[in-house]
């Protein structure tokens, strides 16, 4: 990854510490998030107003482009700028990581927040307690977030079997959700590196040996491994998620190769303790702790690396309703961080390359779907093609190219067969059709956040142990 574009004397130590952003954060309930703006610290207040302002600007701007004579020229110019950035992403050469650790291996603390996970928690605990890593150099903490099923009993029995397994039971009064659980256990851990997995994770035995060497570069604050869908063959939705995860990790690696932003994805994330402390831990005022931490790490001038191999397996949701709930949470949390940290972003605190990459991503992922509705309405009223057609075409093309490239990169270690290109093409076409749901999710989320006084309700993803 290229060096950060900020000069050396602009070190993050000379800026306001990021942990001060969270110092006044109050805690919230987990399963139903009902907190209103008045109970939030200043940085996280007024999210609805900010979202409404952005929505107004996007809608009025899109309508104006249909009414002015130079609207088409503006869109072609924007498409050109996005296209140049896209070409850079496509042709970037991924970073080659150091595979061996120089010196002694650091201590690693593995954290899992679990609530009512009786179907999967035993397998995960045994999996994590038998990783290929020197004995005494890692520990496993499972935080039982006041489960009402057999999870506490299962964990109690497993703790007798494995010395490295430690269990923290949270009370019914504990708040903060997953972020609160992770923050509560963090002072009890010893690791220089903190790993976080979901309860349905399936972890490769040599995972730590692949990830830990990446932290030898001092600016690396976190590493995200590729997420793979364990039950990918089940139906259309899980097959689509498999292709989606391939697209996501490909984009992450290509963006970081350009000096852009790597992002955390929750399951399979590894964070340097020093970086986590400097950012103030996990934010308990967000519904997507991983996406929020991504921004704070970059604002604090840390880098995030993304690793294709090995992958962490997880269950994909199997129904359209479950997918809708999950993706709405991801969309709201992802959009929310732009509203929370917009002033620091505009101050270029991340550095020019990262700020530019982030803005290109925001335009494609959030602004374009939001603008699609007024663009379509104006096209119908004025009996003309949608103004945003060129930008939309570029976005879809990048999705197709990235998905095919990601799927092919995953298959690189497999023996080539004559039918492989056709299989990849079929998976890409199916994945592209599946990805259209994001257009509806994003456009509805940005609109809903502008009008609803509450933040999104969190609906627990049920894990059944499928795909094992």
UniProtKB/Swiss-Prot annotation:
Temperature behavior of the protein's activity: The activity increases with temperature.
Stored CDD domains: CESA_like
Residues annotated as transmembrane: 51-71, 72-92, 361-381, 387-407
Cell compartments where the protein resides: Membrane
Biological process terms in GO annotation: glycerol metabolic process; membrane lipid biosynthetic process
Provenance organism: Trichormus variabilis (strain ATCC 29413 / PCC 7937) (Anabaena variabilis)
Main location per the UniProt record: membrane
Function of the molecule: Glucosyltransferase involved in the biosynthesis of the non-bilayer-forming membrane lipid beta-monoglucosyldiacylglycerol which contributes to regulate the properties and stability of the membrane. Catalyzes the transfer of a glucosyl residue from UDP-Glc to diacylglycerol (DAG) acceptor to form the corresponding beta-glucosyl-DAG (1,2-diacyl-3-O-(beta-D-glucopyranosyl)-sn-glycerol). It can only use UDP-Glc as sugar donor.
Top-level enzyme category: transferase
Reactions the enzyme catalyzes: a 1,2-diacyl-sn-glycerol + UDP-alpha-D-glucose = a 1,2-diacyl-3-O-(beta-D-glucopyranosyl)-sn-glycerol + UDP + H(+)
Entry cofactors: Mg(2+)
pH-dependence annotation: Optimum pH is 7.
Protein name, per record: Beta-monoglucosyldiacylglycerol synthase
Phylogenetic placement of the source organism: Bacteria, Bacillati, Cyanobacteriota, Cyanophyceae, Nostocales
Coiled-coil segments: none
GO annotation, cellular component aspect: plasma membrane
GO molecular function, one term: hexosyltransferase activity
Keywords: Carbohydrate metabolism, Glycerol metabolism, Glycosyltransferase, Lipid biosynthesis, Lipid metabolism, Magnesium, Membrane, Transferase, Transmembrane, Transmembrane helix
Family: Belongs to the glycosyltransferase 2 family.
Membrane-topology annotation of the record: Multi-pass membrane protein
EC number: 2.4.1.336
């Amino acid at each position: 990854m290229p060096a950060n574009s900020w000069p050396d004397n602009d070190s993050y130590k000379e800026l306001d510490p990021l942990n001060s952003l969270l110092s006044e954060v109050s805690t919230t309930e987990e399963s139903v998030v009902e907190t209103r703006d008045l109970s939030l610290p200043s940085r996280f207040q007024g999210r609805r107003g900010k979202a409404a302002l952005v929505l107004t600007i996007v809608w009025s701007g899109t309508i104006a482009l249909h009414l002015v004579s130079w609207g088409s020229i503006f869109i072609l110019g924007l498409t050109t700028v996005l296209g140049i950035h896209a070409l850079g992403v496509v042709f970037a050469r991924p970073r080659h990581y150091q595979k061996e650790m120089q010196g002694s291996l650091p201590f690693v603390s593995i954290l899992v927040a679990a609530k009512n996970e009786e179907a999967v928690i035993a397998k995960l605990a045994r999996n994590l307690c038998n990783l290929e890593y020197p004995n005494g150099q890692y520990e496993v903490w499972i935080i039982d977030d006041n489960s009402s099923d057999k999870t506490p009993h299962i964990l109690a029995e497993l703790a007798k079997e494995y010395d490295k397994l430690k269990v923290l039971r949270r009370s019914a009064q504990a708040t903060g959700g997953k972020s609160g659980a992770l923050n509560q256990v963090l002072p009890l851990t010893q690791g220089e590196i903190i790993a976080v997995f979901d309860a349905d994770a399936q972890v490769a035995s040599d995972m730590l040996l692949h990830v830990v060497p990446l932290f030898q570069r001092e600016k690396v604050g976190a590493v995200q491994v590729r997420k793979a869908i364990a039950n990918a063959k089940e139906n259309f939705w899980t097959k689509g998620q498999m292709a989606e995860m391939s697209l996501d990790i490909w984009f992450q690696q290509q963006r970081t190769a350009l000096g852009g932003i790597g992002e955390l994805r929750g399951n399979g994330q590894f964070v340097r303790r020093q970086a986590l402390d400097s950012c103030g831990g996990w934010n308990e005022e967000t519904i997507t702790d991983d996406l929020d931490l991504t921004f704070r790490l970059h604002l604090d001038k840390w880098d995030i690396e993304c690793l294709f191999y090995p992958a962490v397996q997880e269950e994909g949701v199997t129904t359209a309703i479950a997918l809708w709930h999950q993706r709405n949470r991801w969309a709201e949390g992802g959009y929310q961080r732009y509203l929370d940290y917009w002033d620091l972003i505009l101050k270029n605190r991340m550095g020019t390359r990262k700020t530019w990459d982030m803005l290109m991503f925001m335009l494609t992922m959030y602004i374009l779907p939001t603008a699609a509705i007024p663009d379509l309405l104006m096209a119908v009223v004025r009996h003309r093609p949608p103004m945003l057609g060129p930008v939309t075409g570029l976005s879809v093309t990048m999705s197709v190219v990235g998905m095919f490239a990601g799927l092919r990169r995953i298959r690189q270690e497999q023996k080539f067969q004559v039918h492989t290109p056709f299989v990849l093409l079929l998976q890409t076409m199916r994945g592209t059709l599946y990805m259209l749901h994001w257009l509806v999710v994003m456009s509805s989320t940005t609109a809903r956040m502008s009008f609803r006084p509450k933040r999104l309700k969190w609906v627990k993803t049920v894990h059944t142990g499928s795909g094992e």
